[in-house]
Amino acid sequence: MKEIIAIGGGGVGRNPGEGLIEQYILDQTGKNKPNIWFIPTATGDSEAFKVNYYTTFSKLDCNPVHLDFFKRTPDLEKLISEQDAIFVGGGNTKSMLAVWKDWGLDSLLLKAYETGVVMSGVSAGANCWFERAVVDSWEDELKVIDCMGFVKGNFCPHYDEEPQRRPSVKSFLEEDIFDVCYASEGNAALHIKDENDYLSVDFGKQKQSYLVSLVQGKVSEVAFESLSLRT
C-alpha cells in the first residue's frame, strides 16, 4: 500500500512530546518498532526542530533518526532503504525541494513510497507530496509552486491558522490556477491511501481536511470523513 499523511499544522514542531499524530503515523507501518527518518531540510536542519522531534518520538516505540543536509551528508540510498516511515518538517517548501532535487532525494523518496514506506510531514512536509501547493516561501505573499507529485492534486496547509490562506485558495480557484484544492486545518491531517482513499485525521478539537472547489462561483468546502485521535 502507498500512504501519505499530510499534516496541516501542529504536532511535533508545536507540541513536542504529545505524540498523537506521530503515533498514528507509526501505527500505519504495521511494525512493532518501526524505523522513522526525520528530514528537516525546510528549516535548514534546525537544531530546535530536531530537539522537538526526538522529544516526541523518543517517547514512542520506534527507532528515530534524522537527516542533515547542511553537514556531511550520509549515504541517502542506504539510509532510506532502512526506513518504515518518513517525517518531513515544515519551513520553506521551495528551498527544500531544490536541495532534494540536487541531491537526488526526490527520486529516492518516490522509490520508497512506491514500495510501501509511509510518507508524512507537516506544512512544507505535507506540501511536497502533491503536484502543486500553496506556499509561503516568499516573504510578501502566498504562491503556488510545483512539488513532487506523488499524488495528484493541489494542497494548502494551515487552512484555518493563517488569515490569508482561505482567500488565497479562493483566488487561485477563481483564476483557474486550481480546479480543486485539498486543504488541512492546523491539528488535522489528510491520510491518502493508494492515491484514491482519503481520510481526515483530527488530533486537535474538531479539526478537518477539505476538498475545496468553486460551485456556481462560490467556494465549496466538502469535509472528508474524519477520525478523531482524542476520542
Give the label of every model feature segment.
Residues 93-103:
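Glycine/threonine-rich flexible loop motifs
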Residues 64, 119, 208-211:
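Hydrophobic anchor at the start of a short beta-strand
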Residues 14-15, 96-97, 130:
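Glycine/Thr-rich phosphate-binding loops of Rossmann-like dinucleotide-binding domains
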Residues 6, 66-68, 87-88, 120-122, ...:
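General beta-strand structural signal in soluble alpha/beta enzymes
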Residues 39, 44-94:
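A glycine-rich, hydrophobic loop/mini-helix early in the fold
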Residues 87-90, 113-132:
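Catalytic nucleophile loop
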Residues 1-33, 43-51, 58, 85, ...:
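C-terminal and late-domain segments of enzyme folds
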Residues 24, 79-82, 103-116:
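Catalytic-core regions built around general acid/base machinery
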